[in-house]
Amino acid sequence: MSIKIEKIDHIGIAVKNLEEKLALWETVFGVKAEKIEDLPERGVKLACLKFPHSPTVELVSPLNDQAAVAKFLAERGEGIHHFCFNVENIESAFEELKKKGVQFVQDKPYQGAGGSRIVFIHPRSLGGVLIELKEDRPKK
């Protein structure tokens, strides 16, 4: 059995100053942020930029020094932080990958931005790449 990946949802880019980098991306590419959201429980603020026929670009900055993205920025500087795949069912994907020996950053999926359910695969499981799995909130 394998998990059902629907698409690459977004590419997360870690930035130190969200407002500054968002203005730069908007100027360079002529797009506006579709969404800007604070996630204080995760210690991050993010802005999502939509491009035609492409994954979203998610700019992510820390709200505090304890946020995982703050540690990433201190160790590696700004740049690509993660790739996100949409999955059909986050719970079954999580359980299936655990059976295959995949290590996760969290103990279980949790609520992400916009009411989605997410979980991160630890970089040591996939050659140093942080992968987010995301199940979108059901559309009403």
Stretch-by-stretch model annotation:
Residues 27-33, 101-103:
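Conserved acetyl-CoA-binding loop of GNAT-fold acetyltransferases
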Residues 66-68, 112:
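Serine-centered coil/turn micro-motif
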Residues 3-4, 37, 47-50, 57, ...:
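Vicinal oxygen chelate
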Residues 8-15, 25, 49, 54-60, ...:
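Short, structured motif recognition centered on aromatic/hydrophobic residues
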Residues 21-26, 97:
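Conserved active-site tyrosine of GNAT-family acetyltransferases
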Residues 1-20, 78-87, 137-140:
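N-terminal beta-strand motif that seeds the catalytic metal site of vicinal oxygen chelate
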Residues 72-100:
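Mid-chain, well-packed structural core segment of small domains
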